[in-house]
Amino acid sequence: AVHRAFFVNSEKITKDFYAGFKKQHAAFAKFITGIDDEIDIKNNRNKQWYASVMLNRLMFCYFIQKKGFLDGNPNYLRDKLRECIEQRGRNQFFSTFYLRFLRRLFSDGLNHPKHDREFERQFGRIPYLNGGMFDQHQIERDYADIDIEDDAFVSLFEFFDKWQWHLDTRVTASGKDINPDVLGYIFEQYINDRAQMGAYYTKEDITEYIGRNTILPFLFDRIAHSSKTVETMFAPDGWVWQSLKMSGDRYLFDAVKQGWTPDWREKIPQDIAVGLDTEAPDLLARRARWNDRTPEPFALPTEIWRETIERLQRVDSIMAKISAGEITSVNDFITYNLDIRLFASDLIAKSESGSFIYNFYDALRSVTVLDPTCGSGAFLFAAMNILEPLYYECISRLDEFKDNPKVKAALDEINQKYRSNIHYFIYKSIILRNLYGVDLMAEATEIAKLRLFLKMVAVVDVDYRADNLGLDPLPDIDFNIRCGNTLVGYANEKEIEQDLSHASDILQELANQEFKDRIEQEMQTVAATYREFKRLQLVQEEHFAEFKQAKAELQNRLNTLNDTLSRRLFIATKGDPGELMFQPLFEEWLASHHPFHWVAEFYQIIHGNGGFDVIIGNPPYVGYTRKNKQTGVAVCEIYQVPNSYSTLPTSNLYAFTIERSNILISSVGKLGMIIPISAFANDSMLELQLLFKQKLGETWISTFHQRPAQLFEGVLQRLSIFISNKDDKHIFHTTGIYRWYSENRDFLFKNLAYTVCRQDLQPHLIKVGCNLEVSIFEKYASNTPISTYLADAGTNNIYYRT
């Protein structure tokens, strides 16, 4: 009931706030001067972008001022604006609130560790945040004369002050609560509206389902092979699976178990139970009431008896497998839709092995999770929520095994590296070590970082007696979450080598080898610089000057490396236009294609780890050659993806993204995304289906209709979610097509049922929901089709009477 109340309340809040937010954003941009003022506001992308930058910073400040981090004043910004306006009224030579106050607050205050007495006299006591959010922005570097009129802030703060800003998810009756979850929806909606690129707001149930069924199976696989001791625990008769065998129904979701008891057959009404026997005669007559609505306590919302019986029988089947010890693979948790998060938590709590606890913690510290089209960070946010409790539970147990040298080293690192509290340290570790995202839209990446930072600040309370008000600096993740084109650029060293393999003579061959060696050395240097940059953030005694120098060095080296690779890619794809025309044509190509060189940006992952461990997301559903209805321009007219894409004939960006992800993922990685159902059904997507059959391993596909309810609110789109392993098991598990009502949304993903389906029966990836449907398909495929009995031409006459 509380969850439903929050859902209903937050839905109304998000719609109301978003409507006002859009108006405020449009109005705010009009007050900005000094950014391409000659361009009309509608087409002035940089001015619109800077309006977003400012609103993001100010919303972050609204959250932290309500927690007391801005001089202990919950109305800090509004009061400082009033002071500036009053002073300006008395002295016309005073500059605007933006120039006189905000720019200094951001650069010398929130982005600087030391504040002198003169600063504190004007600004009060505020924390050093770091995080990159208050660094000088690219637009601020490009445009030196930016100013914003005071009226922009008067209107904006009046709008913000109508709402209650807090960093938890409390439910109140005010209908005015703004928290990071609500803001996440608003950001997603805003980015999607701005991008007009076939992206939709992905709700938490989708991101959580995909996240838990990729991240946790990967962690289990890594832990199982971490040491001989732990490997024994994961053997079929080992401690891990014996724990599951003795667990009863603990790991079945409550929604699946609704109304289930071992003797449910005796408890259901007799006129329903009479239809259970499939061998006795008159089956249809005995099941006459199976289409009636199921009453409590057996029913889920909208369920009829036929559906209830199928669910209860499925519980019987799963329970039999658990108690017989037949489930001995982490992938079975996906197949039978068991609560793998609870299972992982229980194993950590119950294990008496220091090796198991340490290796679980070590796997958590090292897993790399990527969203290649991250938008405003919905999937990264879900990944953090999945990882955080496991981090905490492992750390809570480590102290019991501190005699183990590896455990002691891990504890020393933890004890040295956090001041605020353990949860803050965990979030910081996750954001720096585990999460990576790329998006073509710079605004989206900035919002993704903001959402992650808000999650961190939420777990810290202000402490006026402590240094920096008790707040550790936020992590700078400018090199974790990047802006660029996922589809264009060098993914790995193999792609660079392919472009260097077409030498015309021995001199060209030698030059190519020299280029390759130089690039390899530069990439290693960038990776080493990145490791040092990250290390400085994870140590407690972070030195500001040293940190800033490390960041500048990393950025400069990366810029140089990217420029070198982009020039090589431009020549490889467009040819060499000659010295005179090269630079203007190269810059034009650079501006339209925004190449992202994965092997340079994430060398330590692509080269050192063989790719990312987990890739999740919701790629854009956009036709490559289809013209946008609003702009009249097709993607292929803006940039061209390489001809090497095998999925190019599908002509859709989501197919290209999946193919790209298959290259970026490690040989033992997990891949999960939500995409249109057409991916597995249409002739136009055969190349993508071939990729699933030939290059991905064991796969689970669940499918959802657009009526009566939709996964993306208000969007009539039939969708599929796939989870794939990178292995040699070409097994496909599918569900039927789920048609569901909105009141069933809370139970939808907990009630999925998969069936193993042969995929050699037809070219497409067929979707079946039970063994009966599999049998029908097999019979259909094994018999001679009617078409073989039909002749294209015959000698018989046909007479027709009019």
Task: Name each model-derived stretch.
Residues 234-247, 406-410, 690-691, 697:
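Long amphipathic alpha-helical scaffold regions
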Residues 69-71, 197, 221-226, 394-398, ...:
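Short, flexible/disordered secondary-structure transition segments
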Residues 364-367, 432, 652, 719:
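Short coil/loop residues immediately preceding or within conserved phosphate-binding loops
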Residues 389-393:
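Post-Walker A helix-loop "phosphate-sensing" segment adjacent to the P-loop in P-loop NTPases
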Residues 1-386, 434-444, 484-487, 566-627, ...:
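Preference for the N-terminal adenyl/adenosyl cofactor-binding alpha/beta module
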Residues 1-134, 202, 381, 388, ...:
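Signature of N6-adenine DNA methyltransferases within the class I
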Residues 21, 213, 281-357, 402, ...:
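SAM-dependent nucleic-acid methyltransferase catalytic core
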